[in-house]
Amino acid sequence: LKAMEIFNLRAISSAESGKAPVMESSLLKIKGSIIRQKTSDLLRKAIGPQALPYISEQFDEGWNQETIGPEYAGPLAKQYFIYRKISIYGGSNEIQKNIVAKSEFRM
């Protein structure tokens, strides 16, 4: 994560100096989506079966039924599936990899 932070700062510095950080932006998108997916998967696995149920009503005001597992475990499965699509929207990771390759090989 520290490496991602430093890379982000480099991209910002590059943009501020007038250089378009095309390759840096693509690499940040790829790596950021992979990190988010892996951390959500790890968290889901660490919580175990209690991360599986998602009852949206439990987050509504006035919900007074017992939740399945700890309160923080409820949205984990939903978050996991939301983070799976990060590599697709905003330009799929495959497209971003093509941008990096073209930038690197000056195509």
What are these model-predicted stretches?
Residues 1-107:
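Alpha-helical interface subdomain recognition
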